[in-house]
Swiss-Prot record:
<dbReference type="InterPro" id="IPR003439">
    <property type="entry name" value="ABC_transporter-like_ATP-bd"/>
</dbReference>
<keyword id="KW-0813">Transport</keyword>
<dbReference type="GO" id="GO:0042626">
    <property type="term" value="F:ATPase-coupled transmembrane transporter activity"/>
</dbReference>
<dbReference type="GO" id="GO:0043190">
    <property type="term" value="C:ATP-binding cassette (ABC) transporter complex"/>
</dbReference>
<protein>
    <recommendedName>
        <fullName>Energy-coupling factor transporter ATP-binding protein EcfA2</fullName>
        <ecNumber>7.-.-.-</ecNumber>
    </recommendedName>
</protein>
<comment type="similarity">
    <text>Belongs to the ABC transporter superfamily. Energy-coupling factor EcfA family.</text>
</comment>
<dbReference type="GO" id="GO:0005524">
    <property type="term" value="F:ATP binding"/>
</dbReference>
<dbReference type="Pfam" id="PF00005">
    <property type="entry name" value="ABC_tran"/>
</dbReference>
<comment type="function">
    <text>ATP-binding (A) component of a common energy-coupling factor (ECF) ABC-transporter complex. Unlike classic ABC transporters this ECF transporter provides the energy necessary to transport a number of different substrates.</text>
</comment>
<feature type="binding site">
    <location>
        <begin position="40"/>
        <end position="47"/>
    </location>
    <ligand>
        <name>ATP</name>
    </ligand>
</feature>
<dbReference type="InterPro" id="IPR030946">
    <property type="entry name" value="EcfA2"/>
</dbReference>
<dbReference type="InterPro" id="IPR027417">
    <property type="entry name" value="P-loop_NTPase"/>
</dbReference>
<keyword id="KW-0067">ATP-binding</keyword>
<dbReference type="GO" id="GO:0016887">
    <property type="term" value="F:ATP hydrolysis activity"/>
</dbReference>
<dbReference type="InterPro" id="IPR017871">
    <property type="entry name" value="ABC_transporter-like_CS"/>
</dbReference>
<comment type="subunit">
    <text>Forms a stable energy-coupling factor (ECF) transporter complex composed of 2 membrane-embedded substrate-binding proteins (S component), 2 ATP-binding proteins (A component) and 2 transmembrane proteins (T component).</text>
</comment>
<keyword id="KW-1278">Translocase</keyword>
Length: 293
């Protein structure tokens, strides 16, 4: 299900003294089945943008097309409920939205709200709990007895139980330790590959953006500043830093090595493994002479 933004503008508190423009002139497409990252400094428009993906917000101007659904200024999409089933959104700290007596009831809430029978919803809950790497015996427990990481996975299972075609992730690893962050990101990537889900990730973690995303959209002051592959986007390191966007640690180390040893590493290195390989290649080609001078 392809998603397209066409000249999208959004203003909060439109036509009031408190009006504030959050998005303008946003033209971007998310072809079906891809993995995308949206990055940018705080306040750049990332969260406002993704709230247009399932009709939580409506453009002030322009059009958002999500498959066969069109959302535009002044026109209400009649099938928002169906759209929200197709586009699952995992907001920051989704575990705060858990409320039922048991894990099973919490996961079943979405499917039953969309008209699925109780028996079918329970089957979806069993499948979803396994998709997020938890044991089915947790279904009978209260979600509030679980660890923070388990609660987050339960909340994500509730989104997956509705079988979305698009999974939107707004800082999904916020507050987790490094091990938990890595496990969750690997889980999302596995779902993307095995289920063919379109994934749209909003993140401040540049390592995650570089590692997982096929395309990266850089937002700045409410519009698209840069778009391309990780290699293309992070080749504009100086420009990104000027607008407050962090760089992957491998690029920071690359700069430090170049400055320290007076060598040039031409390739954009997006992982420490890439950086190690490129440093070895440069030294083999004679870069070590620069190091010793």
């Amino acid at each position: 299900m392809e998603i397209t933004f066409q000249k999208v503008e959004h203003r909060y508190q439109y036509k009031t003294p408190f009006e504030r423009r959050a998005l303008y002139d946003v033209d971007v497409s998310f072809p079906s089945g891809g993995y995308y990252a949206i990055i940018g400094h705080t306040g750049s428009g990332k969260s406002t943008m993704i709230q247009h993906l399932n009709g939580l917000l409506q453009p002030t101007n322009g059009t958002v097309q999500i498959g066969e659904h069109f959302i535009s200024a002044g026109k209400k999409e009649k099938k928002l409920k169906l759209l929200r089933k197709k586009v699952g959104v995992v907001f920051q700290f989704p575990e705060h939205q858990l409320f039922e007596e048991t894990v099973e009831k919490d996961i079943c809430f979405g499917p039953t709200n969309f008209g699925v029978s109780e028996e079918a919803a329970k089957q979806k809950a069993r499948e979803a709990i396994e998709l997020v790497g938890l044991e089915p015996d947790l279904l009978a427990r209260s979600p509030f007895e679980l660890s923070g990481g388990q609660m987050r996975r339960v909340a994500i299972a509730g989104v997956l139980a509705m079988e979305p075609e698009v999974l939107v992730l707004d800082e999904p690893t916020a507050g987790l330790d490094p091990k938990g962050q890595n496990e969750l990101m690997e889980m999302f990537y596995k779902l993307h590959k095995e289920k063919g889900l379109t994934v749209i990730l909003v993140t401040h973690n540049m390592e995650d953006a570089a590692k997982y995303a096929e395309q990266i959209i850089v937002m700045h002051k409410g519009t698209v500043f840069l778009q391309g592959s990780a290699e293309e986007v992070f080749s504009h390191a100086d420009e990104l830093e000027k607008i407050g966007v962090d760089l992957p640690m491998s690029l920071k180390y690359k700069r430090a090595i170049e400055e320290k040893f007076g060598i040039s590493i031409p390739k954009a290195t997006l992982s420490l493994e890439d950086l190690t390989h490129e440093v070895v290649q440069v030294l083999r080609k004679g870069g070590h002479e620069s190091c010793s001078s």
